[in-house]
């Protein structure tokens, strides 16, 4: 069983490189441990995840405010919150601070110490007052951010799971102290709902109540949502009750405009790691079956997550009449409607199908000689391999109904 699981990770890593999802960082110079570069389809997948998250938790709500804070912050931010003293992992019997330190300034006497942020949360807390002053929100309300974070991990490993540079999607949701348990449960349900919607296998999700000494120094309650990775059951996302720790650390408060009451809100924090989300979605989507006497690998993405919705292919790329029809009457039509449409005329049609299966493209559309006479095309389904003849005029609706 362990050998099969290791083999699955090898297949995922190999597919990601072969199909242009993810590459080792600085690969032509031997790489750099804990870093990865994103190829064309990896960027598309990651952007789909981020856009869906932002739409669900920001655009579709009236109590959420976005922010995009600077990666470099005044070092006093990290001193105030205890990160300089406490953000550490054990190493050789000592505590090793995993924040990446840097210097700002050109002249020696003006150089200031700063850090590459180890989390995106503080960028929201230091903008709490700005957000309240600008928008006058009523409790409960939240702030949301998507951005890079950095940690000097002692032992980066397991592909995207543990890296030194990664991306987070975080929410800080501000509530009254007496309401924290209600909203903790609310955000737990919201997180589980989002996981299912993006195509994570919910049979592989487990909730772990993190015990006192295992929790971060700012948390009074934490749940880890663990995923059954090939290398074991490990944290995917987290939900924390940060109490009033951060706002109190920054000496920030909130005045209720209705009764002029001054309070320090408490915070519920749903945290989503994008890189781990990508890995969980890839592992959930990866399937193999038998087609034409051969083993076929394909990524069964939800259409909303798929880097490509459909691939358009002229049956023969050396036949100008097929190429022209495919380009003008099919590709241009679908590209304008769906955006995530690509042109594929490389290799025979069987190889194109296999390539698009590994990319996770739900539909392949082939323009052949019959198309020139009856204005129909072959639409091939990724999951079943079945093919249908569809009128070009019906293509948009056909695809729209299935995504």
What do the predicted segments below correspond to?
Residues 1-403:
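NTP/phosphate- and nucleic-acid-binding module
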